[in-house]
């Protein structure tokens, strides 16, 4: 990992705004109506390449993929792991009234599914992790940032958004999530 003794290195974490065309494809995938998975892959690859270049151009030292290929920073795991087929809950954000632009974007979106955990958690699509890595590596090769990293959902944030209806205790749920997600953390 890059270090500096002369200045604070810059980075960020979290989701960056997705291009509208990519957002529409992600929403179609989420709704189960995506017909062209190749178009989604190409759109993610293009968007990640552009956002990495923009970060380099903005002098960000340690860039990320902005989570552009994920429907949500924590809920994407439902597509990669088993055990998330239960009825979910939707949280209502009271602060939306103060941010009408954010509310308007949310209204256009069909929403992100937040199923609950209702079965044993295991990997069902480990290859998706490698796809994310390959897309990011291609973007990094083109833009040549000083350093790059990728995020992964923590067990705590997954447990917060995807409620447990299967494991006997929250501790057991978190421990299982940590054990399974460890493979993504180490990839």
How would you name each of these model-derived features?
Residues 1-187:
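Domain-level signal for soluble alpha/beta catalytic cores
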């Amino acid at each position: 990992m890059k270090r500096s003794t002369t200045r604070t290195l810059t980075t960020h974490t979290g989701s960056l705004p997705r291009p509208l065309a990519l957002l529409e494809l992600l929403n179609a995938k989420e709704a189960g109506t995506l017909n062209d998975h190749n178009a989604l892959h190409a759109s993610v690859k293009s968007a990640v390449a552009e956002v990495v270049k923009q970060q380099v151009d903005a002098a960000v030292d340690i860039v990320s993929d902005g989570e552009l290929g994920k429907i949500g920073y924590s809920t994407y795991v439902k597509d990669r792991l088993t055990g998330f087929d239960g009825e979910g809950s939707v949280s209502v954000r009271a602060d939306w009234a103060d941010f009408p632009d954010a509310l308007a974007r949310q209204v256009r979106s069909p929403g992100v599914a937040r199923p609950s955990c209702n079965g044993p958690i295991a990997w069902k699509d480990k290859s998706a992790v490698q796809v994310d890595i390959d897309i990011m590596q291609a973007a990094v090769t083109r833009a040549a940032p000083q350093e790059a990293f990728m995020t992964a959902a923590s067990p705590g944030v997954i447990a917060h958004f995807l409620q447990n209806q299967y494991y006997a205790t929250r501790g057991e749920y978190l421990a299982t999530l940590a054990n399974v997600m460890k493979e993504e953390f180490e990839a």
